Structures are given as structure tokens and as C-alpha cells.
């Protein structure tokens, strides 16, 4: 289901990503949720939710990287 606010995000996202990365995750998830509503638009047998989470993480990884300190940092 789409997320209305950052506070609605899963704990595994809220506790590891900085605020801006959470915004990216939320927007990408919501967009993918709409885009991949039809099963034939998804790869493999992934559910709509699984697909949306994969897209959201890919969007975050496009702008952020996990550092040696195990924290997410904006790429320069």
C-alpha cells in the first residue's frame, strides 16, 4: 500500500535512511505501486509490494551509498 508520510514507512527504512533518502524511498515506492499494479508488468512472480520496495531501494541507491560506518550518505 502507498505511504502517505515518512512516519508510515517500514521501521527498516525509517531507522537506517536519512530524512531526504526516506523522501526518495516514499515517492519511488508510491510511483512503483501505481506503475506495477498489473501482474504482467512485473518481473518473475514478485508481488506488487515486493516490486515497489525493490524500485524504492534502487532509487535510494541512485543518490545514496552505504558507508564504511554502515550509515547511508549522499553520493557526491
UniProtKB/Swiss-Prot annotation:
Highest taxon, organism lineage: Bacteria
Keyword Membrane listed: no
The keyword Nucleotide-binding is assigned to this record: no
Record's keyword terms, sorted: Transcription, Transcription regulation
One Pfam family per UniProt: ChaB
InterPro entries: ChaB, ChaB_sf
UniProt family annotation: Belongs to the ChaB family.
Function: Might be a regulator of the sodium-potassium/proton antiporter ChaA.
Oligomer status and interactors: Monomer.
Protein name: Putative cation transport regulator ChaB
Amino acid at each position: 500500500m502507498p505511504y502517505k508520510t515518512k512516519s508510515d514507512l517500514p521501521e527498516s527504512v525509517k531507522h537506517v535512511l536519512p530524512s531526504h533518502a526516506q523522501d526518495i524511498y516514499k515517492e519511488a515506492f508510491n510511483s512503483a505501486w501505481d506503475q506495477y499494479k498489473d501482474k504482467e508488468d512485473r518481473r518473475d512472480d514478485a508481488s506488487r509490494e515486493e516490486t515497489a520496495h525493490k524500485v524504492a531501494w534502487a532509487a535510494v541507491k541512485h543518490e545514496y551509498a552505504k558507508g564504511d560506518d554502515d550509515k547511508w550518505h549522499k553520493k557526491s
